[in-house]
C-alpha cells in the first residue's frame, strides 16, 4: 500500500511532475495524499524546461537543500527517468504503464509493485 510506504519514510518527499500545480493537487487529492505532500509540489510548468530536461527535479532538490546525488526519484515514464538521470539522481521505475525494459534502458532500476519498491528504498542497490 502506497500510503503505508510513504508513512514509513523518514526523509523529505515531494511530487515533481510535468503536470500543472492544479493537476498535481487534484491527483494527490484523489489518492488521499494531499496532507502528506502539502506544498512540496514541483510542476514542470513552473520551470524553464519540462521533462525530459532535469529542471523540475533540480528545483525540488534545491528547495530541500539536498544534493541531487542524494535524491531518489520514483518514476513511471521513460521521459521522467531521463530527466532524473540528467539531474544526477538515482531512479526507480514503476513498471505499471511503461515496460521494465524501457525504464531500464532510460536508466531506472525497475520495480513491479509497492513491496518491491519498499525493499529498494529500505535496502538501496
Each model region followed by its residue ranges:
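Asp-based, Mg2+/Mn2+-dependent phosphohydrolase catalytic module
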Residues: 3-4, 11, 20-125
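Thiol/selenol-based redox catalytic cores and closely related redox-interacting motifs
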Residues: 14
Amino acid at each position: 500500500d502506497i500510503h503505508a510506504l510513504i508513512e514509513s519514510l523518514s526523509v523529505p518527499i515531494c511530487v515533481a511532475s510535468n503536470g500543472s500545480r492544479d493537476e498535481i493537487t487534484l491527483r494527490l487529492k484523489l489518492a488521499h495524499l494531499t496532507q502528506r505532500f502539502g506544498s512540496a509540489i514541483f510542476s514542470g510548468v513552473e520551470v524553464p524546461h519540462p521533462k525530459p530536461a532535469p529542471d523540475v527535479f533540480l528545483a525540488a532538490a534545491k528547495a530541500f537543500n539536498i544534493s541531487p546525488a542524494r535524491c531518489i526519484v520514483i518514476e513511471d515514464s521513460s521521459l521522467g527517468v531521463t530527466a532524473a538521470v540528467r539531474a544526477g539522481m538515482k531512479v526507480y521505475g514503476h513498471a505499471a504503464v511503461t515496460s521494465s525494459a524501457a525504464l531500464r534502458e532510460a536508466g531506472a532500476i525497475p520495480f513491479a509493485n509497492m513491496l518491491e519498491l519498499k525493499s529498494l528504498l529500505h535496502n538501496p542497490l
